[in-house]
Design a protein with these regions (language model features):
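Single conserved hydrophobic/aromatic residue that forms the stacking wall/gate
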Residues: 1-13
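A short glycine/serine-rich beta->alpha loop
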Residues: 23-32, 62-69, 123-128
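DPxDG-like acidic metal-binding loop motif
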Residues: 33-55, 76-78
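Alpha/beta catalytic cores of group-transfer enzymes, especially the acyltransferase/condensing modules
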Residues: 53-101, 167, 173, 187-189
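Active-site rim beta-loop-alpha module in soluble metabolic enzymes
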Residues: 105-167
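Glycine-rich, charge-dense phosphate/pyrophosphate-binding loop(s)
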Residues: 144-243
Length: 243
């Protein structure tokens, strides 16, 4: 009996699993680092189990963990996504982002925790402000889909969260002005902040990034922000993969 127990025990013992996480996404900066970790964990576990879950099932599970699909959908699917979570079901549409665009993430040296960013929002908003944002929410994907990059600036204007969160983001107004001066088609707060994201034409990328680098040096130390990190980014239309 003892020999059989030992044999069965040996059969159940598997090599230990070592997990090493390398996450280049700055944390607590409004860039979806938590969602990226959720997707990485789910994809890794799914692969180890033999890919038992399909993409829709993974998206639903990730949304249940995160609480909303806003970040996990693009982290999993890539591209530009529009998503709704209703009665436990995620409805999501993805479209590739035009590669003629490039992106700049301007990351300050301070964090803005999601809890603090949410607390800054008012309990109620004016009806006209809600309408203002709804019209732009419809214009953003339309502008991307039709290649109307000239509309991205007005499409990303906001009255529901940026006016309340930017006072918590030292130097953000100056960064907005700098990015527009450097030729950005659109500038907006990434997620809940504290990162500012700017969109430009790839044909102007060299001048755009050079102008940002030079301008950010002059803003360092302004209003309590000691330094900014400039991340030069491309749109990822592939989404999460397991290698």
């Amino acid at each position: 009996l003892h020999k059989e127990y030992r044999r069965q025990r040996q059969m159940c013992i598997r090599d230990s699993l070592k997990i090493v996480q390398t996450n280049p996404i700055p944390m607590a900066r409004g860039l979806g680092s938590s969602s990226a970790c959720i997707i990485a964990g789910l994809l890794g576990a799914n692969r180890m189990l033999g890919d038992v879950l399909n993409t829709q099932e993974l998206l639903t599970l990730a949304t249940a963990i995160e609480g909303h699909p806003d970040n996990v959908a693009p982290a999993l699917l890539g591209g530009l996504t529009s998503s709704v979570f209703e009665d436990g079901v995620v409805y999501s549409v993805k479209r590739d982002v035009d590669q003629s665009l490039c992106f700049a993430a301007i990351v300050p040296d301070y964090k803005l925790l999601t809890e603090a960013a949410r607390a800054a929002l008012p309990k109620q908003v004016a009806h006209k402000d809600a309408v203002y944002n709804l019209s732009r929410a419809a214009l953003v994907p339309a502008a991307f889909c039709e290649g109307r990059h000239d509309l991205l600036g007005i499409a990303t204007e906001d009255k529901l969260h940026q006016p309340y969160r930017m006072p918590l983001m030292p130097g953000s107004r100056e960064v907005f002005a700098l990015a527009k001066q450097c030729g950005a088609k659109a500038v907006y707060v990434s997620g809940a902040g504290s990162t500012v994201m700017a969109v430009a034409e790839r044909a102007e990328a060299e001048r755009f990034y050079a102008g940002l680098r030079a301008g950010l040096e002059t803003l360092e130390g302004l209003d309590g922000c000691e330094a900014f990190t400039l991340l030069e980014l491309d749109a990822d239309n592939t989404g999460a993969t397991v290698e």
